[in-house]
Amino acid sequence: MAIYHLRATMISRSAGRSATAAAAYRSASHIEDHRTGLSFDYRARSGVDHVEILAPAQAPEWAQDRAALWNAVEAAETRKNSQVAREIRVALPAELDHGQRVELVRDFCQRQFVDRGMVADIALHAPGREGDDRNHHAHILLTTREIAAEG
């Protein structure tokens, strides 16, 4: 039986964090931050089972591109103490297979966030090589604002 764990945090500039760095790390990808000029490359990272972006139907096509999405979010927030994204980390039942875990997270994100106008950047992580082999979990990065057709 899975043990419930959900943690919600904000990604804010005042804490020295950025949405581009968080998205690159959680998805094991490479993102160049246009605001700072920094490059975040985590493509060599292992343990990421599934990545996906869910966006409202009216969202522009570029919202499906991780680098474009999070750079647009960073550009839209101009204050030095801006909260640029919300992150949710949730434990997933080890009793489910991979496909069932993906569907569970998709359904949760669609109902709770995407249907309310937010974009959800999903990354499912496998348990680490050392430690509890039941530690399947998801990282969900969310826009803090609704996204419209014009962005």
Regions found by a protein language model. Give the residues of each.
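N-terminal nicking endonuclease/strand-transfer module with a His-rich metal-binding environment
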Residues: 1-151
